[in-house]
């Protein structure tokens, strides 16, 4: 039986600001929308870190808890916490089965964390994951390039998700944007 999945998360660093947006759709299998208003972008570590997930909901909550523990352990050092989470995620036989991806960001860093041990910081200050991630990333890049002078990070993040929601059937228009 298929699990709960599907979402789009987009994050951007732009003009000294940072924003992360996520839609609210939770899909069961390929045919049933179970929830429209899920909150997949969260503030962690005293509100100083944003984290968004795509993938299995239960797995993502497990990873959020683990990541928050790593942030506490390393006193908010985002790169170190992300690397340690990725190492544990990849090396533990039980955790290796978790099906989710995370985007995490603070005032200085924007990182993608995956269960294959990858911790990636983008060159262009933008990341997107999930079923509509490619659409959101393309939209975000276009918005930043052609309208970036007149748009904030929050506005670009929201618009990128709106465009992805118009294209991807697993992404809805109930968008939550968090800003640092």
Curated annotation (Swiss-Prot):
Protein name, UniProt field: ATP-dependent protease subunit HslV
Gene3D superfamilies in the record: Glutamine Phosphoribosylpyrophosphate, subunit 1, domain 1
One annotated GO biological process: proteolysis involved in protein catabolic process
Predominant place of localization: cytoplasm
Organism encoding this protein: Geobacillus thermodenitrificans (strain NG80-2)
Protein's job: Protease subunit of a proteasome-like degradation complex believed to be a general protein degrading machinery.
InterPro entries noted in UniProt: ATP-dep_Prtase_HsIV_su, Ntn_hydrolases_N, Proteasome_sua/b, Proteasome_suB-type
One GO term describing the cellular component: proteasome core complex
């Amino acid at each position: 039986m298929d699990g709960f999945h599907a979402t789009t998360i987009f994050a951007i660093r732009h003009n000294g600001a940072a924003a992360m947006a996520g839609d609210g759709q939770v899909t069961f299998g390929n045919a049933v929308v179970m929830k429209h208003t899920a909150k997949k972008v969260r503030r962690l570590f005293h509100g100083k870190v944003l984290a968004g997930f795509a993938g299995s909901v239960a797995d993502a909550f497990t990873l959020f808890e683990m990541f928050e523990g790593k942030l506490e352990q390393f006193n908010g050092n985002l790169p170190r916490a992300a690397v340690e989470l990725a190492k544990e995620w990849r090396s533990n036989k039980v955790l290796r089965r978790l099906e989710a991806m995370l985007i995490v960001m603070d005032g200085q860093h924007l990182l993608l964390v995956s269960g294959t041990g990858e911790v990636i910081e983008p060159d262009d200050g933008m990341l997107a994951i999930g079923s509509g991630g490619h659409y959101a990333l393309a939209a975000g890049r276009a918005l930043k390039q052609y309208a970036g002078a007149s748009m904030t990070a929050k506005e670009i993040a929201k618009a990128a998700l709106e465009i992805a929601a118009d294209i991807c059937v697993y992404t809805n228009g109930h968008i939550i944007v968090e800003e640092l």
